[in-house]
Amino acid sequence: MTNFEKIIAQNRLKTNAVLTTYCAIFAFIGLLVDAIRINANDLGIALFKLMTFQIFPTITIVMFVVAFVIILVCIQNFSSIMLSGDEYKLIDPSKVLSSKENQIHRLLLELLEEAKLHFEPKLYIINAPYMNAFASGWDESNSLIALTSALIERLDRDELKAVIAHELSHIRHNDIRLTMCVGILSNIMLLVANFSVYFFMGNRKNSGANLARMILWVLQIILPFLTLLLQMYLSRTREYMADSGAAFLMHDNKPMIRALQKISNDYTNNDYKEIDKNSTRSAAYLFNAEMFSTHPSIKNRIQSLRKRVI
């Protein structure tokens, strides 16, 4: 197994651990609300009966169904949401392209051949003064890669290819799907925890129901921080994987390092907060300058890239 493959395997284990934690918390919240709904006398016994379907866990099932429906809706509209608010252009190889558009398309084809992939993401150019890029799509069949015009103008050929390789790696690793699911689960968990503190709480006099209420009250306080930490950890792990994937496809870590340095310097020297207001795609960006970012620091990403044995 190569160094790259080991990194991917390790990060997949970490990802699975975080996803398992998310699902466990999600189910636990639903079961607590169900315990309150049935006015449980003993919380432990009630949870066991709900988990073994001796008592039907109505709220828990409804939560999972709602999550599933929202995910389906997002699958149909996610790409348009990610591109919203900007002037953008599809690079359509069946039409006449500019020299720069031709170059970008050729770079993508080279990477697809190198990775032995049999799908071609749609390529978009976003007319924007900031340097950034992102990938979107539920799976390979509806995937896209978007690059800002400033990024295309200021990076050299190898740096641009490395950025496309980074975004292509996100698609290969199913990162967009993962980010979407985690975000939806987080929001539903927070909503249910918050509302359940005020609903189902009427005259619940049994000790089990009151204990469930108390646990939900505590979760209402700590869940925002817990989900933020889990999302940051998960997303940062995926960024390291995508950086490694770019270096692997390029057979060189230097172009990705140079691209990250240039993008970081651009955000250091300019304030783009009022220009780029699409918060939905902040977690999907190649670079995120916020303090509590879903991305690792540029310094850590470069250090990690320099350790890669290509």
Swiss-Prot record:
Matching Pfam families: Peptidase_M48
Cofactor section: Zn(2+)
GO cellular component, one term: plasma membrane
Membrane topology note: Multi-pass membrane protein
InterPro entries: HtpX_protease, Pept_M48_protease_HtpX, Peptidase_M48
Binding residue positions for Zn(2+): 166, 170, 239
Primary site of residence: membrane
Keyword Cell membrane: yes
Ranges annotated as spanning the membrane: 16-36, 55-75, 182-202, 214-234
Entry note: cofactor: Binds 1 zinc ion per subunit.
Entry's family note: Belongs to the peptidase M48B family.
Protein name: Protease HtpX homolog
Primary gene name: htpX
